[in-house]
From Swiss-Prot:
Family in the record: Belongs to the RuvB family.
GO molecular function, one term: ATP hydrolysis activity
Reaction equation(s) it catalyzes: ATP + H2O = ADP + phosphate + H(+)
Source species of the chain: Rhodopseudomonas palustris (strain TIE-1)
Start and end residues of each stretch annotated as Large ATPase domain (RuvB-L): 1-183
SUPFAM superfamilies recorded: P-loop containing nucleoside triphosphate hydrolases (SSF52540), Winged helix' DNA-binding domain (SSF46785)
Protein name, per record: Holliday junction branch migration complex subunit RuvB
Amino acids binding DNA: 293, 312, 317
Role description: The RuvA-RuvB-RuvC complex processes Holliday junction (HJ) DNA during genetic recombination and DNA repair, while the RuvA-RuvB complex plays an important role in the rescue of blocked DNA replication forks via replication fork reversal (RFR). RuvA specifically binds to HJ cruciform DNA, conferring on it an open structure. The RuvB hexamer acts as an ATP-dependent pump, pulling dsDNA into and through the RuvAB complex. RuvB forms 2 homohexamers on either side of HJ DNA bound by 1 or 2 RuvA tetramers; 4 subunits per hexamer contact DNA at a time.
Length: 349
């Protein structure tokens, strides 16, 4: 099974609790997402000048890119209260009502994984977002009655990694949709350098670059790798984290020069050696790796596709020549028709 403790997983792990100290506290400290950051600053400044609640905000993007951090920054920049929860935690309408009725004027309510809200909870959320009212049914049967409760004007900040799972009525109620993208190596270098400074760990420019190159475009992974490399530097009594220390530490942790770990390499090697580079169906790969299909599609494949190691074609998964070079293997000669005309249209399997 896919190990949730993978060092390069973008999902939150238990040891990421230490990331709180590394998080930027305001938009000026936040690195990357330049356009999103600039737009947010405009919307926040305008709401503050008008003394109004900010329009509801939806952050969309892969895990680990700073959606929660930005939500906290929004509240801090507005100078208002911040309450955080997640979609799966709000089990029934009463749970949501309790959260909403305790909000003060212009407060920020952050709902992570908002795509996982149940339909019954969503129905209660619609009038709350649009009219700042709760429509609740009190009692059951003939004695049931509808009650309207006025709410303080608040800002809902939602975060999702799966925008396609949001219902249209919910998505349309967010006035400020913002998509977050993967970070460049230069941006991650700045994040690693700042993180090392916060941790009180000297780091050289090439040491920060080495960590950034292997962080898969994701600040959460960069912070995690930095903490582990710092352990190796401390154990070796190194004066600073330089490229050689970072390279040794990350090699020992099985994170290679492209940021791939043992699971990624196993996936690529299986297609290369067992299936001639593909095409091979995702169900076949799930059986070969003893992994659920969802884990392959949502956890393993996205970064490999982003790096240009893998293509999803109408006939299945296909390794690129770039992947064979990374594995140190000779690429087979293939019919160009294997790549398909329209890219990722799903498996035949």
């Amino acid at each position: 099974m896919t190990d949730p403790s993978r060092l390069v997983t973008p999902e939150r792990r238990g040891d990421d609790l230490g990331d709180a100290a590394l998080r930027p506290q305001n938009l000026s400290e936040f690195v990357g997402q330049q356009q999103a950051r600039a737009n947010l600053q405009v919307f926040i400044d305008a709401a503050r000048k008008r003394k109004e609640a900010l329009d509801h905000v939806l952050f969309v993007g892969p895990p680990g890119l700073g959606k929660t951090t930005l939500a906290q920054i929004v509240a801090r920049e507005l100078g208002v209260g911040f309450r955080a929860t997640s979609g799966p935690v709000i089990a029934k309408a009463g749970d949501l009502a309790a959260l909403l009725t305790n909000l003060e004027e212009r407060d920020v309510l952050f709902i992570d994984e908002i795509h996982r809200l149940s339909p019954s909870v969503e129905e209660v959320l619609y009038p709350a977002m649009e009219d700042f009212q709760l429509d609740l049914i009190i009692g059951e049967g003939p004695a049931a009655r509808s009650v309207k409760i006025d709410l303080s004007k608040f800002t809902l900040v939602g975060a999702t990694t799966r925008a396609g799972l949001l219902t249209n009525p919910l998505r349309d109620r967010f006035g400020i949709p913002i998509r977050l993208n993967f970070y460049t190596i230069e941006e991650l270098e700045s994040i690693v350098t700042r993180g090392a400074r916060v941790l009180g760990t000297p780091i050289t420019a090439d040491g920060a670059n080495e960590i950034a190159r292997r962080a898969r475009g994701t600040p959460r992974i960069a912070g995690r790798l930095l903490r582990r490399v710092r352990d190796f530097a401390s154990a070796a009594d190194a004066e600073a984290i330089d490229r050689s220390i970072a390279d040794h530490a990350l090699g020992a942790l099985e994170v290679d020069s492209a940021g791939l770990d043992a699971m990624d390499r196993r996936y690529l090697t299986t297609i290369a050696l067992n299936y001639g580079g593909g095409p091979v169906g995702v169900e076949t790969m799930a059986a070969a790796l003893s992994e659920p299909r969802d884990a392959i599609e949502d956890i393993i494949e996205p970064y490999l596709i982003q790096c240009g190691y893998l293509q999803r074609t109408p006939r299945g998964r296909l390794l690129t020549d770039h992947a064979f070079r990374h594995l140190g293997l000779a690429a087979p000669s293939r019919d160009p028709a294997q790549f398909g005309l329209f890219g990722d249209t799903g498996d035949q399997e």
